[in-house]
A protein has these predicted regions:
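Internal alpha-helical scaffold of NAD(P)-dependent oxidoreductase catalytic cores
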Residues: 134-142, 160-254
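NAD(P)+-binding Rossmann beta1-loop-alpha1 motif at the extreme N-terminus of oxidoreductases
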Residues: 1-57, 64-69, 73, 120
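Short, well-ordered alpha-helices that flank and scaffold nucleotide-derived cofactor binding pockets
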Residues: 19, 23, 95, 99, ...
Length: 358
């Protein structure tokens, strides 16, 4: 029996996930995987060449993967649907699929690999709770959130890593675990949907701070920063993620010491593939903030950067949440001040040393 899967989003991560699924062989039969891309050149590259040269260059895709620019065609009748677009575009993408019959009737199992928070009338909200407000009631407490210490470049190359499939529905969590797992991709199930979502979003904020500190160190901007300083930042960052997670309803403390917590934070901060780390480094190396007035100006012109650092929007929302819940989060709040041009990078780094209170 053929398993039908739609991946809505043809960026690097969506493409890598589609490749992993399409390559799996199982006793239950083959997998038909379709990727939705609003960019016709990406769609045509996937269909004609089995490549996504724009977002995941050099990676050959299985022949069983097809692409379409018709989102309803992509989603209709699929057993599994994975939303894989950046947080800035998630709700627009979701709304385009609400008329799909298999979604209206609750027949498709839905998961999300998007990282971040979403704006709402009463302040930023987690991704799944925002989606539940728009999807049919059948999907309440059944959506699956997928995260973990992984980069598209490595997952598509078959490097060993792990993911967590989190859902309030244990059955759906296990279904996505079984869909994604392979000999080189370990997938675990979790019921701590809120803790996993907070970890996935907030770690990008810490990664920008890490990139700033790393560039300061390697470029000789300040001899006070070393490897130990970076480890101190990781510890402080994990502490802030857990503080925020607890405030937003995380249910399992071990979430933050698992691959979805410290594991994802570490690889996001240290990997050369990390876009948020890269953005932090370029704040020092290229002085890119000089082109923008504040964080909203960065977000309004995010296309100019050439890649998407999700931590910029997340920093804005984390600051709002920290103030709302009266949380002490000096790294995240300080980064937001830096992106708003209220302080300079050196002041930001020095303030971190002064404000850390573990």
């Amino acid at each position: 029996m053929e398993t039908k899967v739609a991946v809505l989003g043809a960026g690097a991560w969506g493409t890598a996930i589609a490749k992993v699924i399409a390559e799996q062989k199982s006793e239950r039969g083959s997998k038909e995987v379709i990727i939705w891309s609003f960019e016709t050149e990406v769609r045509d590259d996937i269909n004609k060449n089995k490549l996504n040269s724009r977002y995941l260059p050099g990676v050959k895709l299985p022949d069983t993967i097809e692409a379409t620019s018709d989102i309803e065609e992509a989603a209709e009748g699929k057993q599994y649907i994975i939303y894989a677009v950046p947080s800035l575009f998630l709700m627009d993408t979701l709304k385009k699929t609400l008329s799909v019959k298999s979604i209206r009737e609750g027949q498709s199992i839905i998961s999300v690999i998007t990282k971040g928070f979403l704006p709402a009338e009463n302040g930023p909200k987690l991704i799944l709770e925002t989606m539940e407000d728009f999807l049919p009631g059948l999907y309440r407490q059944s959506l699956v959130y997928i995260s973990g210490p992984s980069h598209a470049e490595e997952v598509s190359a078959g490097k060993i890593t792990g993911l967590i499939a989190a859902s309030e529905s244990a059955k759906n969590s296990i279904r996505f675990r079984d869909l994604l797992k392979s000999p080189r991709l370990m997938v675990y199930s979790s019921l701590d949907v809120r803790g996993v979502q907070v970890s996935a979003a907030a770690k990008n904020v810490i990664a920008i701070a890490f990139g700033i500190l790393d560039a300061m160190k390697t470029m000789g901007k300040a001899d006070m920063f070393g490897d130990g300083t970076e480890s101190l930042l990781l510890a402080a960052g994990l502490n802030e993620i857990q503080i925020l997670g607890n405030a937003l309803g995380a249910t399992h403390p071990e979430t933050f010491t698992s691959i979805s917590g410290i594991g994802d934070l570490d690889v996001t901060c240290r990997s050369v593939h990390g876009r948020n780390r890269r953005f932090g480094r370029e704040i020092i190396e290229k002085n890119i903030l000089k082109s923008y007035k504040n964080i909203d100006d960065i977000l309004a012109n995010i296309g100019e950067i050439g890649y998407l650092p999700e931590g910029v929007a997340a920093a804005k929302y984390v600051k709002v949440l920290a103030e709302k819940h009266k949380l002490k989060m000096p790294v995240s709040v300080g980064l937001c001040k830096l992106l708003n041009r209220e302080i300079e990078p050196m002041e930001f780094c020095k303030n971190l040393l002064a404000d850390w209170d573990m």
